[in-house]
UniProtKB/Swiss-Prot annotation:
Protein name: Cytidylate kinase
HAMAP family in UniProt: Cytidyl_kinase_type1
Principal EC category: transferase
One record GO biological process: nucleobase-containing small molecule interconversion
Upper lineage: Bacteria, Pseudomonadati, Pseudomonadota, Gammaproteobacteria, Pseudomonadales
Swiss-Prot/TrEMBL keywords: ATP-binding, Cytoplasm, Kinase, Nucleotide-binding, Transferase
């Protein structure tokens, strides 16, 4: 790892707001951004497109090593776009079904190992904000600041419902709550890199906090550690 490029990790369960927080934080700091969940979603989406069984560990490992993917950085008024094999699949990856597939493939040790170096390659100057589920425990264990962001399952389902309402047909709050609870169980119980806070992580419960309040707390921790210079 490049010791000249500091890393801030933001881990947490599905719907905790870590992606939103990480994106805003990276923009404020002028740092690189790693959405590790997108890599797993990309792999699951590509596997389905290529007819690869989501339980076939060796085939998924091979596919992970050769993913033709580009991340087009966010600009003013335009979010980051994700290009897979020449096609913009950003919106496809936010589908709840793709998220469920991603949770399945993320439980496979060979898949996590194949994507590990791809994730670490994002660590470049002036710094990196990395969001995911094992950023602070496995991918960047030496990061000077680790955040574990959570919220109640009910609040996370409510947030996801508001995101999807009007965009996805047939979405319901109860079904989203069931899916979040199922993903929590898969993510925390998997044998390799289970979802858990790093021993030195700062745990933030965002159930009753606004986005700005969470950001203020993180910026305070950055200042205390003098991470961003």
């Amino acid at each position: 790892m490049n010791i000249k490029a500091p890393v801030i990790t933001i881990d947490g369960p599905s719907g905790s707001g870590k992606g939103t927080i990480a994106g805003i934080l990276a923009k404020r700091l002028g740092w690189c951004l790693l959405d590790s969940g997108a890599l797993y979603r990309l792999l699951a989406f590509a596997a389905r497109n290529h007819g690869v069984d989501l339980t076939n560990e060796e085939s998924l490992k091979l596919l992970a090593a050769h993913l033709d993917v580009q991340f087009v950085g966010a600009t003013e008024g335009h979010p980051q776009r994700i290009i897979l094999e020449g096609d913009d699949v950003t919106d496809d990856l936010r589908n709840e079904q793709v998220g469920s597939w991603a949770s399945q493939v993320a439980a496979l040790p060979a898949v996590r190992d194949a994507l590990l170096q791809r994730q670490r390659a994002f660590q470049e100057p002036p710094g990196l904000v990395a969001d995911g589920r094992d950023m602070g425990t496995v991918v960047f264990p030496e990061a000077p600041l680790k955040i574990f962001l959570t919220a109640s399952a009910e609040e996370r389902a409510r947030r996801r419902y508001l995101q999807l309402k009007g965009k996805v047909d047939g979405v319901s709050l109860s079904s989203l709550l069931d899916e979040i609870r199922a993903r929590d169980e898969r993510d925390t119980q998997r044998a390799v890199a289970p979802l858990k806070p790093a021993a030195d992580a700062i745990q933030l419960d965002s159930t009753e906090l606004s986005i700005e309040q969470v950001l203020e707390r993180i910026m305070s921790e950055i200042a205390i550690r003098d991470i961003a210079g």
